[in-house]
Swiss-Prot record:
One of its GO terms (molecular function) is chlorophyll binding. This is Photosystem II protein D1. One of its GO terms (cellular component) is photosystem II. Photosystem II (PSII) is a light-driven water:plastoquinone oxidoreductase that uses light energy to abstract electrons from H(2)O, generating O(2) and a proton gradient subsequently used for ATP formation. It consists of a core antenna complex that captures photons, and an electron transfer chain that converts photonic excitation into a charge separation. The D1/D2 (PsbA/PsbD) reaction center heterodimer binds P680, the primary electron donor of PSII as well as several subsequent electron acceptors. 2 of the reaction center chlorophylls (ChlD1 and ChlD2) are entirely coordinated by water. Herbicides such as atrazine, BNT, diuron or ioxynil bind in the Q(B) binding site and block subsequent electron transfer. The lineage of its organism: Eukaryota, Viridiplantae, Streptophyta, Embryophyta, Tracheophyta. Belongs to the reaction center PufL/M/PsbA/D family. Fe cation binds at H215, H272. Keywords: Acetylation, Calcium, Chlorophyll, Chromophore, Electron transport, Herbicide resistance, Iron, Magnesium, Manganese, Membrane, Metal-binding, Oxidoreductase, Phosphoprotein, Photosynthesis, Photosystem II, Plastid, Transmembrane, Transmembrane helix, Transport. It holds the Pfam family Photo_RC. It catalyses: 2 a plastoquinone + 4 hnu + 2 H2O = 2 a plastoquinol + O2.
Length: 353
């Protein structure tokens, strides 16, 4: 009898826990994805803060030349970064217990791998939590679908690209100037500016900014007057009110006359779908582009593609970009190799005598 009562009590405790986890009445929804999201994101955030402040220099290139990234080792907010895991580690799983000591783990950039893997798990669970909350509230699932774009982008630069290049040392550093360095080296090695998927991503981000500004300014300019001149126009809206707060017909008429009739949406639902879909699809393509360039399927190469009747090269903008790429490639990891791959692949000219 005692055993039965204990089992019922434990089942009741588990049931209450399940109800609490999945309750939409909590101030912040947890959900089953949140059970994994909370510890992973807390771990990633805590280690990032500690490492950004105090981590010792990391031998990123695996050539016994440590690079300092933390504030206590001479950096500021702009130059500081979590330095990627050493090329000596490659793609090996490198938790603390795999190193001979904590000093060795820090020297080889163990915190970067710890942060990145926990962060990617955390943001993936955040996306799942968005879907889970939408499901429990009877909403459609498109919030999580939209969030999949930045998740895909983060996964591309922190996981897919290192896998394709064979080492976590090629991942994006976790810092401002480190991100810029990653972008410059990526251009030098993969010619990303000439990749059509990157072009679609630029159109997505810049176009999304333009459409967001256009939509916001049109709505703000066609608000239905509910206030006097001495009050803020924002006071004319009450949360949850049934009537429209702006005149979509006026906005449609204005924009249709500014450009042409069919450039303006006359359906609020299709308009907002477009505003969401445009940047999301663009960022999807960018993430896909990073993932293909990870395996060296690079941007277009139009170098020396125009010649005159005598066979002499007429430089185009592609040749100017190529020269810049070579310059950037020569400068990065300058002590890890003598020549960039593009130059090393060219046969040395024959000499007489």
């Amino acid at each position: 009898m005692t055993a039965i009562l204990e089992r019922r009590e434990s089942e009741n405790l588990w049931g209450r826990f399940c109800n609490w986890i999945t309750s939409t009445e909590n101030r912040l929804y947890i959900g089953w994805f949140g059970v994994l999201m909370i510890p992973t994101l807390l771990t990633a955030t805590s280690v990032f803060i500690i490492a950004f402040i105090a981590a010792p220099p990391v031998d990123i290139d695996g050539i016994r030349e440590p690079v300092s990234g933390s504030l206590l080792y001479g950096n500021n907010i702009i130059s500081g970064a979590i330095i990627p895991t050493s090329a000596a580690i490659g793609l090996h799983f490198y938790p603390i217990w795999e190193a001979a000591s904590v000093d060795e783990w820090l020297y080889n950039g163990g915190p970067y791998e710890l942060i990145v893997l926990h962060f990617l798990l955390g943001v993936a669970c955040y996306m799942g939590r968005e879907w889970e909350l939408s499901f429990r509230l009877g909403m459609r699932p498109w919030i999580a679908v939209a969030y999949s774009a930045p998740v895909a982008a983060a996964t591309a630069v922190f996981l897919i690209y290192p896998i394709g290049q064979g080492s976590f040392s090629d991942g994006m550093p976790l810092g401002i100037s480190g991100t810029f360095n990653f972008m410059i080296v990526f251009q030098a090695e993969h010619n990303i500016l000439m990749h059509p998927f990157h072009m679609l991503g630029v159109a997505g981000v810049f176009g999304g900014s333009l459409f967001s500004a256009m939509h916001g300014s049109l709505v703000t300019s066609s608000l239905i007057r509910e206030t006097t001149e001495n009050e803020s126009a924002n006071e004319g809206y009450r949360f949850g009110q049934e009537e429209e707060t702006y005149n979509i017909v006026a906005a449609h008429g204005y924009f249709g006359r500014l450009i042409f009739q069919y450039a303006s949406f006359n359906n609020s639902r299709s308009l907002h779908f477009f505003l969401a879909a445009w940047p999301v699809v663009g960022i999807w393509f960018t993430a896909l582009g990073i993932s293909t360039m990870a395996f060296n399927l690079n941007g277009f190469n139009f170098n020396q593609s125009v010649v005159d009747s005598q066979g002499r090269v007429i430089n185009t903008w592609a040749d100017i970009i190529n020269r810049a790429n070579l310059g950037m490639e020569v400068m990065h990891e300058r002590n890890a190799h003598n020549f960039p791959l593009d130059l090393a692949a060219i046969e040395a000219p024959a000499t007489n005598g």
